[in-house]
């Protein structure tokens, strides 16, 4: 915790309306504490600017009180609290009053204010930092690569249909290729040309035999 501003101010008592000199400390958390003297032994009163203060008046804005003898009205400062209480103050000069107004206004509106002249509280320095929260280290994910790691199914493909010249259809089962651990090898296509014959049945059987032989040889090349 740190002091934002400290100094002497005249404060008017609530009952006898007499002016008394008090030492004021404005903390960075918004607390305004005033003591009997600068030794800070006896606390006269305290106000939390962000919680209790609803208005801050300066100079001619101040109401229901007059400055002490020998002081100008532009030295006056009035703090209005939520419960209706007012704290009537008088600074040493108009410039000092303006400096207090700026510091108090910032303490009332800002969540964390630290002034230029900062003095640190010994209790804040000696306090321990917040406890460290340990987080568990996430376990690394293991991914397997290599042979036999793919468990997906090949897409279903129906049998291949070949038609002879007479219109008769022949079904040949589709053979799934084996890719192995090094990917799919280049396909080998085998084309067998038969001599033209007048017999349509012999031509169809030749085409069917050539297709079956090509697929068998292609599967053999894929394996190697």
Swiss-Prot record:
Gene3D superfamilies: Pleckstrin-homology domain (PH domain)/Phosphotyrosine-binding domain (PTB). PROSITE patterns: PH_DOMAIN. A 1,2-diacyl-sn-glycero-3-phospho-L-serine binds at residue 20. It comes from the Eukaryota. SMART domains: PH. The keyword rRNA-binding does not apply. Residues 2-109 form the PH domain. CDD domains: PH_evt (cd13265). InterPro entries: PH-like_dom_sf (IPR011993), PH_domain (IPR001849), PLEKHB1/2 (IPR039680). One of its GO terms (cellular component) is membrane. It is found in: Recycling endosome membrane. The PH domain specifically binds phosphatidylserine, which is enriched in recycling endosome membranes, it doesn't recognize PIPs. This is Pleckstrin homology domain-containing family B member 2. It comes from Gallus gallus (Chicken). The gene is PLEKHB2.
């Amino acid at each position: 915790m740190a002091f934002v501003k400290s100094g002497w101010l005249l404060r008017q008592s609530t009952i006898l309306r007499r002016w008394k000199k008090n030492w004021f400390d404005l903390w960075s958390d918004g607390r305004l504490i005033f003591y009997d003297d600068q030794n800070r032994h006896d606390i006269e009163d305290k106000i939390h600017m962000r919680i209790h203060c609803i208005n801050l008046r300066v100079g001619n804005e101040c109401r229901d009180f007059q400055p002490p003898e020998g002081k100008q009205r532009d030295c006056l400062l009035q703090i209005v609290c939520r419960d209706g209480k007012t704290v009537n103050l008088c600074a040493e000069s108009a410039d000092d009053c303006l400096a207090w107004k700026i510091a108090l206004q910032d303490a009332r509106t800002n969540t964390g204010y630290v002034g230029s002249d900062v003095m640190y509280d010994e209790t804040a320095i000696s306090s321990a930092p917040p406890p460290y929260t340990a987080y568990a280290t996430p376990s690394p994910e293991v991914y397997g690569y290599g042979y036999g790691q793919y468990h997906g199914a090949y897409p279903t493909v129906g049998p291949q249909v070949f038609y002879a010249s007479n219109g008769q259809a022949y079904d040949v089962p589709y053979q799934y290729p084996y890719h192995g651990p090094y990917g799919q090898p280049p396909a080998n296509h085998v084309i067998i040309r038969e001599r033209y014959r007048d017999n349509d049945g012999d031509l169809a059987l030749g085409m069917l035999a050539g297709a079956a032989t090509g697929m068998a040889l292609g599967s053999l090349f894929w394996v190697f």
